[in-house]
Amino acid sequence: MREEEIQEHQLFISSLFLWVKLKMQNKLSSKRKKMRWKIIFFIIASTPFRWIQSSYLFFKLSKVNLETNQPVFVIGHWRSGTTHLHYLIAQDKQFSYLEAFQAFFFRVAFVSKTFMRPVLNYFMPSTRPQDNIKIDASAPTEEEHPLTNLTEKSGMQTFFFPQNKTYFDKYNIFENTKENEKRAWKKVYHKMLCQIALFHGKDKKLLLKNPHNTARIKVLLELYPKAKFIFIHRNPYDVYQSNIHLYNKTIKSQF
């Protein structure tokens, strides 16, 4: 199967501090030098906008209250149909959700949405490479993407650096995770959800879809005791074959 050459990366609008930390924690493939330089370029170019957004959100995030309107989580193994279910439930206007634009430009979304949303729509493929599901800048997507943009404490970092499964072990299944590391994960995750809620109007209930959360139910309930979970499953043989396809089309092209 032909390997898909991914032109963009979730770490484009991260921080230099996070990028250096990830480089120190991983041995990067020599084949991906061009992508590494692109990441550094976009990190530097986005720095002023990240500072402006941080200042803008400094007092606003503290006013977002997720205690009284706790999230609904769609969970299930990768390739089980979580995206289809997320798209379907997101049609209900009582919910707000993370859209692709905010996910990709998370650190600058509030200050760049007027001019960057049409740019993203122009450059985005019309379908996802792994399954041909239609996407655009407004499509619902999973919050694990911006989590990788904010911290190394994300299971998806193992997707970006497939030779290092520490991220998955420590921040998906919380195996051998120190208590202070778990607290740090909760803090950054909660702050991220507040930012997602604020982007769409903080009074709506958050609808979140994230296969990584399937292994985090206990930790999420510590954060949101009244949260609801919707679990979807699929024939495991189909799931296995679909994940092989996902690996060959996207994950294989990472660092």
Question: Where would I find each of the regions flagged by the language model?
Answer:
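Charged, amphipathic alpha-helical linker segments immediately N-terminal to NTP-binding catalytic cores
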Residues: 2-51
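Glycine-rich phosphate-binding P-loop
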Residues: 74-91
